Amino acid sequence: MTSLHKQIIESHNNDITKLKSSMSTRAAARRSVCLSSMSYTLGADDVTPITSNTTPSNNNNNNNTTTTITTTTTTPTISPLKQSTTGSIIPKSILVTKSGSKEEPIVSSSKSSSNSSSINNNFNNLYSASTFSSSTKKVHERPSINPGFRKPREALLSGNSDSGIIKKPSSSSTSSSSSSSSTTSNIKAPIQISHSSNSGSSSSGGNNNNSDDNSGSSTIKHTAASLSKMKLSPSHTISDSPRSSTMKSRSVSISNGSLFSPTNTSVNNSNNNTSSNIKTPTKSSISENLDQNTPPPPSSSSTTKTPTATTTTTTTTTSSSSSTSTNTTPSKSSVDDVFARLANVSKPAIKSRSLSVSASLARVEQSPPTKDKGDKESSSSSSSSSSSFSSKFTKILRSSSKTPTPTSSNTTVQPSTTSLSASKISSRKDTKSLSSFSTTTTTTTLKSSSSSSSSSSSSSKSNIASSSSSSSNNLTNLLTQSQSISSTSTSTTTTPTSTSPTLASSMSVLSSPTSTTTTSTSTTSTTTTPTKSSCTIITPSIALKLYINDLTSAEQSEILDYPQIYFTGNTNKKTKFNSQLPNNGYDNDIGEYKVVERDHIAYRFEIVSILGQGSFCQVVKGYDYKTGEMVALKILRNQKRFHNQALTEIKILEYLKTNDPNSTASIVHLNNYFYFRNHLILTFELLSMNLYDFLKVNHFQGYNLNLVRRFGAQILTSLRFLSKRNIIHADLKPENILLKSPTKSGIKLIDFGSSCFENEQIFTYIQSRFYRSPEVILGTKYDKSIDIWSLGCILVEIFTGVPLFPGSDEPEQLACIMEVLGAPPKSVIDNSTRKDIFFEDDGTPKPVKNSTTGELYTIGTKSFKDSIRSGDEDFDNFILDCLKWEPSQRITAEQGLKHDWIIKVIAPTAPSTPS
């Protein structure tokens, strides 16, 4: 090896050594922040930050050189708060310093003096935010963190630590118990805290010349005026309920209250049953998002009134169990009891399903703490590595950003977007399914009274880029805690929901139609709840540049046919184009579309889950990125006969929507329809469970007559609306009657795929078997009275829990009817085109065996009243009026609404419909 080669290698090694040295500061900071966030997530019941050094304490050892080892921690409060002689709340705390190998606990005096020379030398690397909080809960100690290694999770969980207990000097001038502090360990460019007064300034290092030696360090300077104001500075209260062993999630929602509106913050402590109500005028009102608004336990309470800039309350909530109580007796459930249990079974469907931008940025390099504006020198920690990322990220955000506002902005990221920029940042292997969870990140910039902290040049363009959050992948992203890197305080919570789409950590801002990013100087709020805000649209050319890796080769050509792109899919299981397979590989053998969850529909909708599948179509739950709403998408089979049938359905649905714009007729509304990959797709409003599932959650025991009456009145209202327009639904059944809400009795009719106008009958084989009228079975002419027959069968099933006529085929179905109602009139048999199948030549029914017992059915041997045992004569008469052999003798929808059994609820339940 020549000397030239050796020189090149030596030079290369020197460059690497210098690079490692320059990167050590940021690397240590990132490790400290990650471990701090992980420990906060895993074990800290109550993490209370250390108070900023508002008053320096006396220390005569200014010239002693000490090796200060500090950690990036949020120190838990060990002992209860004690009231000082001046009325300030002072916590007991101890600062442990290491001089060589010897540890010396130092307890500073509680007396404050304006002429105090310095805070202890061991505060050299301590930087603290100017916020204060108080807490009384005892938590485990945190382990120290050395920059060269990361302790295993077990040490964090057990709370064992090799380092001493950290206590801070008490001071009577301190107005609050503690404040958040963040320090780095063994960093070459320590962050110093300088306090200036009329008598001079003192540095918190072992030598007053440390600031000169460490030219790259960030210095936070305080004047006497700022220190006096800091005594009255607003407190940042963080109240955490203890986590249970099952790692319950936290819930924080941002209220829509006006600025500076008084907010009552309730803190519940499940350990000691104490509650404290803190009434503060808040700049950003953050309220608790609970399942129910319940008052705090009345055992003990304390009220504190404090002027605050921002009050953040984080409360642990336990999501309701999705299991319902099992009834062992066939007793009818009361209405209130049913919907109370349903409230635990199913939560509102539209909850957000996506991680916030800050959560996505947790996987990239976090920007270092920013310098004060008074310091003209840029910090060495604010290096070009973070600026390169921030500049790229900001350029992408520009296309979706609104006009910057000087106060606050809301950034909404919709469910599991592959969205448009963070997919370049976050690895797909980090994608986790977080069904029924939504993450809300609230980032609040706290201003110092003397001078406000400015973001670094790379991250000043966007508040999102300036504050990154760190999430614990080891916990499979079930809990996400956000850690502030600059002079911002970030709070991240996870809210449980039940019907949310599965979350993916690969996010993008631009693919969310409601995402708005603005530069904010005071408050930036990032939430995942879908809202109806203005959407962001990108062109196919931009989508190809940003997401070409997320698109298949066929999609890269297909996307050019769609002028507006909202979503490109968030899955690596996309269907591949194959010209040798049916519909180029997008369909199965019978013409059904191959549904892939998390994929897109027409570059606008995200497929969340499959709701149902029938002989004509598939129904999926999707998220509309244009409107920010959850919708139901009906994907028709790729066959001509189904296509023609769907065109008739569209014609009827649009006619109904035109005649019922306010949806008073309890009929589902069609939102839109379009073609995608040779499939006709219809979009509808998303409703709750159908009545069959409603019976299923009650273990098919049926419901009381009051609830049955409510359903009956609403169905009659819909049938009257259809009857006036000569429309036959032709497929009434419990599966096609959906609850509007899982906790209320409002319903809507769906599925008009078999419907027709009365004078334009298309099909002869209609209606589901259990609810099929005799004229359809016998092949005679039918009219809108077939829906009345179906109504009678449905109401009996809701009451009893089982079908009234459960035939396995048409002969058995007709035999079941004749067993209860007797033989049909001769006129009905004579008009039948299929009488040879069911009757002998003399008109007697052919024998039919019970498919379950094997016994022959007999005619008229089963009493109707004995079959249902309702005990309500009006109900029995109403059902019998619906189940007449002759269609002309059946009750009409108009007459049904005036029936004695229905009239009791017609006023509140059946609103007037358009004429």
Curated annotation (Swiss-Prot):
<keyword id="KW-0808">Transferase</keyword>
<feature type="compositionally biased region" description="Low complexity">
    <location>
        <begin position="352"/>
        <end position="364"/>
    </location>
</feature>
<feature type="compositionally biased region" description="Low complexity">
    <location>
        <begin position="433"/>
        <end position="533"/>
    </location>
</feature>
<feature type="region of interest" description="Disordered">
    <location>
        <begin position="349"/>
        <end position="533"/>
    </location>
</feature>
<feature type="compositionally biased region" description="Low complexity">
    <location>
        <begin position="399"/>
        <end position="425"/>
    </location>
</feature>
<feature type="region of interest" description="Disordered">
    <location>
        <begin position="51"/>
        <end position="119"/>
    </location>
</feature>
<keyword id="KW-0418">Kinase</keyword>
<feature type="binding site">
    <location>
        <begin position="611"/>
        <end position="619"/>
    </location>
    <ligand>
        <name>ATP</name>
    </ligand>
</feature>
<feature type="compositionally biased region" description="Polar residues">
    <location>
        <begin position="234"/>
        <end position="260"/>
    </location>
</feature>
<dbReference type="Pfam" id="PF00069">
    <property type="entry name" value="Pkinase"/>
</dbReference>
<dbReference type="GO" id="GO:0005524">
    <property type="term" value="F:ATP binding"/>
</dbReference>
<dbReference type="InterPro" id="IPR042521">
    <property type="entry name" value="DYRK"/>
</dbReference>
<feature type="compositionally biased region" description="Low complexity">
    <location>
        <begin position="51"/>
        <end position="79"/>
    </location>
</feature>
<feature type="region of interest" description="Disordered">
    <location>
        <begin position="132"/>
        <end position="334"/>
    </location>
</feature>
<feature type="compositionally biased region" description="Low complexity">
    <location>
        <begin position="261"/>
        <end position="287"/>
    </location>
</feature>
<dbReference type="InterPro" id="IPR050494">
    <property type="entry name" value="Ser_Thr_dual-spec_kinase"/>
</dbReference>
<dbReference type="GO" id="GO:0005856">
    <property type="term" value="C:cytoskeleton"/>
</dbReference>
<dbReference type="InterPro" id="IPR011009">
    <property type="entry name" value="Kinase-like_dom_sf"/>
</dbReference>
<feature type="compositionally biased region" description="Low complexity">
    <location>
        <begin position="170"/>
        <end position="185"/>
    </location>
</feature>
<dbReference type="InterPro" id="IPR000719">
    <property type="entry name" value="Prot_kinase_dom"/>
</dbReference>
<dbReference type="InterPro" id="IPR008271">
    <property type="entry name" value="Ser/Thr_kinase_AS"/>
</dbReference>
<feature type="compositionally biased region" description="Low complexity">
    <location>
        <begin position="108"/>
        <end position="119"/>
    </location>
</feature>
<dbReference type="GO" id="GO:0004712">
    <property type="term" value="F:protein serine/threonine/tyrosine kinase activity"/>
</dbReference>
<feature type="active site" description="Proton acceptor">
    <location>
        <position position="731"/>
    </location>
</feature>
<dbReference type="GO" id="GO:0106310">
    <property type="term" value="F:protein serine kinase activity"/>
</dbReference>
<keyword id="KW-0067">ATP-binding</keyword>
<dbReference type="GO" id="GO:0005737">
    <property type="term" value="C:cytoplasm"/>
</dbReference>
<keyword id="KW-0723">Serine/threonine-protein kinase</keyword>
<comment type="similarity">
    <text>Belongs to the protein kinase superfamily. CMGC Ser/Thr protein kinase family. MNB/DYRK subfamily.</text>
</comment>
<feature type="binding site">
    <location>
        <position position="634"/>
    </location>
    <ligand>
        <name>ATP</name>
    </ligand>
</feature>
<protein>
    <recommendedName>
        <fullName>Probable serine/threonine-protein kinase dyrk2</fullName>
        <ecNumber>2.7.12.1</ecNumber>
    </recommendedName>
</protein>
<dbReference type="GO" id="GO:0004674">
    <property type="term" value="F:protein serine/threonine kinase activity"/>
</dbReference>
<feature type="compositionally biased region" description="Low complexity">
    <location>
        <begin position="300"/>
        <end position="333"/>
    </location>
</feature>
<dbReference type="GO" id="GO:0004713">
    <property type="term" value="F:protein tyrosine kinase activity"/>
</dbReference>
<keyword id="KW-0547">Nucleotide-binding</keyword>
<feature type="compositionally biased region" description="Low complexity">
    <location>
        <begin position="196"/>
        <end position="218"/>
    </location>
</feature>
<feature type="domain" description="Protein kinase">
    <location>
        <begin position="605"/>
        <end position="902"/>
    </location>
</feature>
<feature type="compositionally biased region" description="Low complexity">
    <location>
        <begin position="379"/>
        <end position="391"/>
    </location>
</feature>
